[in-house]
């Protein structure tokens, strides 16, 4: 990292114009390899079959790749050979796949440089509180807002988009022309979009080898459309909230209207009147977005039509209307940040007395509830090889070579993180099933290591060996948002706690979304 910073400090005014030579530096691929080692514990290392070592850490392959890139047209021939022999199983196809993987990882590290430089705090900047970055701080806000809304648009952000659009969007952030040409070459040589994208997923994802590069391109695309989207929302709302009667100089009001029309595109002028609801909330979570409104069904339907036209005219692809669902909040639940959130309607009757007359008033109260998604978590555990798809615990063979303390520590850490992350759940009893799966999976992993049975292992080591799986999570010194709410579920009080020290999604929920 010091070598990379030293390279960038050579010419601070033209940092973005000198990214392309970094492609031919060996330490770039070392950084990409280190990033892979720091990934989630649920990802298993990818090894070259028959060679017995990690392909990303092989300096021989990296130097061979750099030498081939220096040669004229060698990379093009390599990619074409890979496209022609991807189903043959030939060695050339195998090594071309490794080349494309290393190029993708290395180029992703290079593209991240302009973004990371903007995140480096200066010495004069006032340090911000880390608690404001907590994921859990979003839920108290949603609880206060969602219970007052009527309709929600469940949006699946459309894909695919044209490859050239991706390059043009990234061009707004990076002015290095050779790097953009290299990216265009890399994408168009792998022009078979169906091989890079899995259309059956809720979000289009690259293959496992190109996932990091895709995330950069995808986030750039989302940032571009949200910039225009939020701009229209703010400008139209500000225009609406400042009436001409409030101005002493009416000319300023008309000048503002003319300026807004000049900034907006032609079709934007026709849809500004859609934005009349001041209780509109937009939340995006990876490949999905939620647009909630307090308005009528007609208003939310206009939003749906606008979004379809928005993607069509701005990004030149058709967004299918069935990807945007209109749902009333009264009978709708959505998966968000590892929770299932919904609005619970509680009917109640209030007895009032006026003089000698008694009468009952029926009222409806809406409460936002969050529960643990047990079935998705079991599916995530199944993909991580902790259990079957039906939830039957199995051993973890890749961890059987570790020491007993390391095995127990890994399983225990997963359970503690789950309890800590899902502390805001309204029904914590659902976590007991997940903990049971992890506890038995740990026992079977230990039994596999010692070539014994689970019963004999527990009799020999003691049943208290795995008691920490059912204990509470470790005490964390952190500001919290305690919220005790009375729910008529089983007639008991449910205490929910939102911690302000959680800055990343739980690995199980994150693994489920991106795998």
Swiss-Prot record:
Subcellular compartments: Plastid, Chloroplast
Protein keywords: Chloroplast, mRNA processing, Plastid, RNA-binding, tRNA processing
Any one GO BP annotation for this protein: tRNA processing
Keyword RNA-binding recorded: yes
Signal sequence, renumbered to the chain: none
UniProt xrefs under InterPro entries: Domain_X, Maturase_MatK, Maturase_MatK_N
One GO cellular component, as annotated: chloroplast
Tree of life domain: Eukaryota
Coiled coil: none
GO molecular function, one term: RNA binding
Pfam family, one: MatK_N
Major place of residence: plastid
Family (UniProt): Belongs to the intron maturase 2 family. MatK subfamily.
Biological function: Usually encoded in the trnK tRNA gene intron. Probably assists in splicing its own and other chloroplast group II introns.
Protein name listed in UniProt: Maturase K
């Amino acid at each position: 990292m010091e070598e990379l910073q030293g390279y960038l400090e050579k010419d601070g005014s033209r940092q973005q114009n000198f990214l392309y030579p970094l492609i031919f530096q060996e330490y770039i691929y070392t950084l990409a390899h280190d990033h892979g080692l720091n990934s989630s514990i649920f990802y298993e290392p990818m090894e070259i079959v028959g060679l017995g070592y990690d392909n990303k850490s092989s300096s021989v392959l990296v130097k061979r790749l750099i030498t081939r890139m220096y040669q004229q047209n060698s990379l093009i021939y390599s990619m074409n050979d890979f496209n022609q022999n991807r189903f043959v199983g030939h060695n050339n196809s195998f090594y071309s796949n490794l080349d494309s993987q290393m190029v993708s990882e290395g180029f992703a590290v290079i593209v991240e440089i302009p973004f990371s430089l903007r995140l480096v705090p200066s010495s004069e900047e006032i340090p911000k509180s880390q608690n404001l970055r907590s994921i859990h701080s979003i839920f108290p806000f949603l609880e206060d807002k969602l219970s007052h809304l009527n309709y929600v648009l469940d949006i699946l952000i459309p894909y695919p988009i044209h490859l050239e659009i991706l390059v043009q969007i990234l061009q707004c952030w990076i002015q290095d022309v050779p790097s953009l040409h290299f990216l265009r070459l890399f994408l168009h040589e792998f022009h078979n979009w169906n091989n890079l994208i899995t259309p059956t997923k809720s979000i289009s994802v690259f293959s496992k080898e190109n996932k990091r590069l895709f995330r950069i391109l995808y986030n750039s695309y989302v940032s571009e459309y949200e910039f225009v989207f939020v701009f229209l929302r703010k400008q139209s709302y500000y225009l609406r909230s400042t009436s001409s009667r409030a101005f002493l100089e009416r000319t300023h009001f008309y000048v503002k209207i003319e300026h807004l029309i000049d900034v907006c595109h032609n079709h934007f002028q026709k849809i500004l009147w859609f934005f009349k609801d001041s209780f509109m909330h937009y939340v995006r979570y990876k490949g999905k977005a939620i647009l909630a409104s307090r308005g009528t069904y007609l208003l939310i339907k206009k939003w749906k039509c606008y979004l379809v036209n928005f993607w069509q005219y701005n990004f030149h692809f058709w967004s299918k209307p069935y990807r945007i669902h209109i749902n009333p909040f009264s009978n709708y639940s959505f998966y968000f940040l590892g929770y299932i959130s919904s609005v619970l309607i509680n009917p109640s009757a209030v007895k009032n007395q006026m003089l000698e007359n008694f009468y009952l008033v029926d009222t409806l109260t809406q409460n936002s509830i969050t529960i643990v998604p047990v079935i998705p978590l079991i599916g995530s555990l199944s993909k991580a090889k902790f259990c079957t798809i039906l939830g039957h615990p199995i051993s973890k063979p890749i961890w059987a070579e570790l020491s007993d303390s390391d095995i127990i520590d890994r399983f225990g850490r997963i359970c503690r993180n789950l309890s800590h992350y899902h502390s805001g759940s309204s029904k914590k009893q659902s976590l007991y099933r997940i903990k049971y799966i992890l506890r038995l999976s740990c026992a079977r992993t230990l039994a596999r290591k010692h070539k014994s049975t689970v019963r004999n292992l527990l009799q020999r080591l003691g049943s208290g060996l795995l008691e920490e799986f059912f204990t509470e999570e470790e005490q964390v010194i952190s500001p919290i948002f305690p919220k005790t709410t009375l729910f008529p579920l089983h007639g008991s009080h449910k205490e929910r706690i939102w911690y302000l020290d959680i800055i990343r999604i739980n690995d199980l929920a994150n693994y489920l979304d991106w795998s």
